[in-house]
């Protein structure tokens, strides 16, 4: 039995997945094998030595100390695509709000309440002040064509928009899901120059911090309407407000409110609603639970943010899994120790991600703990697991 500690409210369907696999689940575990979280902040957490993995029911992992987890041999998983429909639907709503001043229009109508019978006439007289253009026939630029970006691009086509997409890391799976009518752009400046609307679906990293800034705003088609449902720090707020003031940016709709943006003209802030639907929470919880169970039971890695993805069907009597430095000679060392135990390797898999590698050996017999300790003593080996 594996012990799973929850650190946030997790959808019941996700907990049911774990319980069906005979896992003990509780928010009070003292020495868990895995953590299942949503937004719990772990940067100051002390991890117990038994902790093998962390499942994030969602996409963003800035609440998890990724480098420290890697150094301690802890796999970190997220759930890409599980909330994609939820975010896509909200973004389509935001697309219209970026065109028409719907928020301002509703507030204006509510302000007319004291006028009583005069309201219909006042509405007809003043409605042009909050009018805006159609999205049909306009061009939407999509930066990042993964699970969410590809769905947004395809949906925008159904609104009779023209769509350009930019993603230098486009995966084969995402490409298959993308309509052939989406124009693939390889120069980001072309996107800025030709699009009327812009939406981003990329991760927040040191490289993407202030991805949109004074320099990029200056390259945009005047009157650009920008949607940010990815991460707030992708946009330089000071430069954005200056671009709105000058008219270079017509409107900004974001799911990440802050003190600089709330209440500003032509800025619409949502209260981080992107993945806040019962369906998305259930999908994320179920997906994270399955990733955790597959890793704990089989050593398979799916959707890890710090280790290479590595999956191998169980083909031997026993399985050995190792997290180690990606350097020459490691596999030979492991194989020597396995052979010394008079055990044969039936199947193996070795995957790398930068400086980190992950290796699975399926063997004819179970190695003894002495062999595992020998491997743990090899410089550069972070974690050794013997699975039945």
Question: Predicted segment positions?
Answer:
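An N-terminal-biased, well-structured beta-alpha scaffold segment characteristic
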Residues: 1-79, 193, 213-215, 236, ...
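Hydrophobic Val/Ile/Leu positions in short beta-strands of Rossmann-like dinucleotide-binding domains
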Residues: 4-6, 142, 322
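Rossmann-like adenosine-cofactor binding region
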Residues: 43-45, 164, 168-261, 276
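Phosphate-binding beta-alpha-beta segment of Rossmann-like dinucleotide-binding domains, i.e.
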Residues: 80-139, 303-305
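Oxidoreductase and adenylate-handling cofactor-binding alpha/beta cores
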Residues: 88-107, 154-161, 287-300, 335-339
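Glycine-rich Rossmann-fold phosphate-binding loop(s) that bind the pyrophosphate
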Residues: 145-146
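N-terminal Rossmann-fold NAD(P) dinucleotide-binding loop
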Residues: 149-150
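NAD(P)-dependent dehydrogenase/reductase Rossmann-like domain
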Residues: 252, 265, 273-388
